[in-house]
């Protein structure tokens, strides 16, 4: 029995331990979550059924319930939803046309006008009352604010009151116009027109006191502008206006036809004046050689026959009549087409003239630095002037050679670099840059003209490397006109080109252009580079410090230092020529040799 009790106690202890340590299986975890969710729901249901006050009373006693009863009278009363009043002075306001006052009409007017004036007086009284009620509803007061801020002057107060009243009157008058148009009442519209005229008179009288109002006199300004304005050559507005006038009033067709006839006569006179001015400009351009007859006719909109006639009449001293030609031109084409074409061609001619003047000015400004006189001709004559520029450049260099000028001494001091290029060389390189930019900006230089220029100039690919810029260097530059002057690298007072000393090399590279330099990292002084390499290899400077002091490229300096110290991962191939044979031996640095009978 004792053993059985011990076993049961051990099982109970194991069950308690198992209950204390939660099972990690997903099934047990799901069941536990379900139990927790159900307990939470029971808690909410208990609070909903029993009531929160009862739970608080059971927890804290009846004193809390008694304290909460003090706030029962403080709850707001229930209010009905807001609804708009049946008759609101602001929402349901009868709006009609209004004015400040209608003056008494003259006795000479007829009886219908007197009846209309009496109706207008009654309308005016109603509208004034409506304006007052509108202002009262707007400001939520019975009367307008009489007592304003004492700091505001009296003149400003009166002006503000007048502006507020004018705003109310105009607002009601505009809404009244809309209602009258919907109802179709003709008599009321006449009253509105008379009221608007009276408002215009009142505004003209009160110009000095009140602010300027442009809304009333806008129609009068439009009619004045139409009468005194410049003639409009567009066909859309005139056609639309003529159609509207013919539809609205058929009796005004004769007046419209007469107006169009006068406009057409005015157009013919103006077009003749414009044509005379354009004709004189076209003849000047043709005589100066800037344009030929075909281009001048297209740009200025003048027939070629007319230009030929005037060119023939100029030497004889008898100017041809251009008005007859314009009449024939207007007869051959319709009125609308000739008008639009003339306007477009006039704009095109003015634009082309401005463009040519702008290009000529830019060319002159570009060549002022090189002390050359570039001809002020059209851009398509550019290839004919290159030869003249070459000759002038040659004469200038010959005159500079007679001047004895010692080249400046190059100081090899750290942090100080002196340019070793002579004055003539600097002028030559700047000139080549200018000529290159001019050749690139000229858009009419075609391939055929360039080929002719290459045939004229001598074909020399080798440049002189011992003196200043010579004629052969300029010729070879123009021979390869599509290259930048950066290809002619300035170094140590010389101009470097593709160096081939033998005739075989020249024959092989007759049809090839020189290789372009790879960038500014090759433009350095070799002596300064040698000094920088020596400083780095001796350990006195690092590569970065030597680059900053001597101004040499960092990558080139580092490569040359590693090459001379033998620390390159892939050393360059060495070319060694055997003394006895004409063979070249290539050593790749790995111990393998290879012979080749052809030099690389």
From Swiss-Prot:
Expressed predominantly in the spermatocytes of the testis. Also found in the kidney, liver and heart. It is found in: Nucleus. The keyword GTP-binding does not apply. Residues 103-124, 239-260, 494-521, 564-600 are annotated as: Disordered. InterPro entries: Homeodomain-like_sf (IPR009057), HTH_Psq (IPR007889). GO terms for molecular function: DNA binding. Its main location: nucleus. One of its GO terms (cellular component) is nucleus. There is a cross-link at residues 241, 318, 339, 396 (Glycyl lysine isopeptide (Lys-Gly) (interchain with G-Cter in SUMO2)). The keyword Calcium does not apply. This is Ligand-dependent nuclear receptor corepressor-like protein. The lineage of its organism: Eukaryota, Metazoa, Chordata, Craniata, Vertebrata.
